[in-house]
């Protein structure tokens, strides 16, 4: 009778064959912008805000086809040819990435799979619930797994170009809320994480053939030791499983992409978050208690190979203005100022990619640096836009002083708390 004597082990990631060599894209500051789009204000805001990092959504099924359509680029992988909509790539990604690459901005692509179109249908997980906007990729058949690998290989090759570079990859969206965002049905957390880690590893191993500096990020919400929604998982449990799987099956350099919104998304006064405490057992991690993340990545057992700290991007984070009344707009700016002082002081936090650039109805509350980009508001800059601009400059201290009274503190000294 056969008996399993060890866990399966993945190939040594340090031995991945490199097809080319590109330089790393280091962060020049901790200030970034989330959800870049092709917009007339792109270059203005990248320059005026001093952006060093950014994210861009990569919805694979929007531009990948299994059969050729007019204007598609053919791409052969594993003996099969797939097709990619060239005009979509140019207008949605290339023109944006050309501007970020010219400025040395480190961009992370967020891999999303809507279950639409022929590629989306093939990539759809067999237990997808039919409701969530995105699906976990189907890696239960050779055909669908190869399709996903082909998409990753195409993207990795195209966007390892120094002139339109994606430096890192965020794997899906808020996977602690898989039931609502990256769906594969209602699964036990270990089953979900086993599948999710395969998606992460596939991306990591393929991308590292083109860019050995690239990191892959787990995307999670502000829930830490509490499920942030019905049917969700606890983030800390997911990270513990990441460590266990990595130890058993072979470690790789995965990193953390946290959505550290206030505990109550509609309340910008994050300094009052009662559920965000200075404890590793906190229910939420928000801009108030980023010290928790800073401590977590500083612990040896959580580090890559036990001694290399994993990156932390606040890849979708910010505060809202519940309305366009002056008080709400000023509270939003104060919430950012408070969070920025924490971010800038904590070595374990690599940066924030503010979400969102413009107010967006799909967010539920107005989170933008700018108002709605419609005929009425025309994307007008909000007070938080100017506060964001001043952050990290010689004008920061003088400009941020106006927010102390609103937050209820006399100075920024002593803001960082010890985590027992």
Give the label of every model feature segment.
Residues 1-62:
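Boundary/entry segment of secreted carbohydrate-active catalytic domains
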Residues 28-32, 52-55, 104-108, 166-170, ...:
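Structural preference for beta-strand elements that scaffold enzyme active sites
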Residues 35-48, 148-158, 232-245, 330-342:
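Short, acidic/polar
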Residues 40, 166-167, 191-326:
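Noncatalytic carbohydrate-binding groove/subsite architecture in carbohydrate-active enzymes
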Residues 52-226, 263-264, 359-364:
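Substrate-binding cleft and catalytic face of glycoside hydrolase catalytic domains
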Residues 72-73, 126-130, 161-165, 180, ...:
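Aromatic-rich peripheral "rim/lid" segments of glycoside hydrolase catalytic domains that contact
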Residues 84-88, 139-147, 187-195, 230-234, ...:
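Alpha-helix N-cap and loop-to-helix initiation/capping positions
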Residues 92-107, 158-165, 202-214, 245-252, ...:
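A structural motif corresponding to the C-terminal end of an alpha-helix
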